[in-house]
Regions:
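Conserved donor sugar-nucleotide recognition element shared by glycan-biosynthetic enzymes
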Residues: 40, 48, 82, 145, ...
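Short beta-loop-alpha junction of Rossmann-like oxidoreductase domains
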Residues: 23-25, 74-76, 172, 180
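N-terminal Rossmann-like NAD(P)+-binding domain of SDR-like oxidoreductases, especially those catalyzing
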Residues: 1-71, 198, 202-203, 207, ...
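Structural element of the ATP-grasp superfamily
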Residues: 1, 52, 89, 181-182
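Short, hinge-like loop/turn segments at secondary-structure boundaries
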Residues: 31-32, 81-84, 179-180
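Short, conserved glycine- and acidic-residue-centered signature motifs
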Residues: 44, 82, 174
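C-terminal substrate-binding subdomain of Rossmann-fold SDR/epimerase-dehydratase oxidoreductases
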Residues: 94-219
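NAD(P)-dependent short-chain dehydrogenase/reductase
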Residues: 26, 50-109, 114-123, 150-155
Length: 219
């Protein structure tokens, strides 16, 4: 992809992950911090970032390198092994099944609504916004898992929660310092988390079956 972009002058928008911070527990995260991937997935994202930045510096390929923080929202598959936590929890709640929380629920995430991610990516494409290195894509809203569960119980009053041992490789806390994001995309305002969560619940209730169990084939 990068080689084609070098040859054609195409603008590359690459999706990386906040998981590249890994062992760095300092909060909030900013783009100048040291990186310490804790999983092969995170390491692969960091390696890809290196290629993107190398093509930008060596060949002047226009690039926008976005580090996503816990993206959620409609059309996200809720039922596979690596499903994101929010659609997975909502899907289980819809089936009347308990949700699993690894740890005591005091872990935090800087959730980012997919609508906001789309706005950022489309603006970068249309206005040719590039980054000098990576840019964290989250607005600094540190949401604790227990608070998220309390919000979900407004939609699923009988929701049951199983608290389990922490998993090896899980990041306990996540929060972005959004200064660079706001300076590059000043016109974009994220939807409040609870409103975005409610929209996600409504979408999964109406359309969840269409994305569960993988892609469908037509006869």
């Amino acid at each position: 992809m990068l080689e084609v972009a070098r040859q054609t002058g195409a603008h590359v928008i690459f999706s990386s992950s906040s998981s590249v911070y890994g062992r760095n527990t300092q909060l909030p995260k900013d783009e100048s911090m040291w990186l310490g991937p804790m999983t092969p997935y995170a390491a692969s994202k960091l390696a890809a970032e290196g290629y993107v930045q190398a093509y930008a510096s060596a060949y002047n390929v226009p690039t926008t390198l976005l580090r996503f923080f816990n993206v959620f929202g409609p059309r996200q598959r809720p039922d596979h092994e690596y499903a994101a936590v929010l659609p997975k929890w909502i899907w289980l709640a819809m089936q009347g099944q308990p949700i699993d929380v690894y740890g005591d629920g005091t872990a935090s995430r800087d959730f980012t609504y997919v609508e906001t991610v789309l706005d950022i990516a489309m603006t970068a494409m249309k206005e040719k916004v590039t980054t000098d290195g990576a840019m964290n894509l989250a607005y600094g809203n540190r949401i604790f898992l227990n608070d998220t569960i309390a919000m979900l119980k407004k939609h699923f009053p009988d929701l049951k929660v199983n608290y389990k041992e922490n998993r090896l490789g899980d990041v306990k806390e996540s929060q972005n310092a959004p200064g660079l994001l706001k300076s590059l995309f000043p016109a974009i305002t994220p939807k409040p988390f609870e409103a975005a969560l409610a929209e996600t619940v409504d979408w999964l209730k109406e359309f969840g079956q269409s994305v569960a169990n993988g892609p469908k084939t037509l006869d």
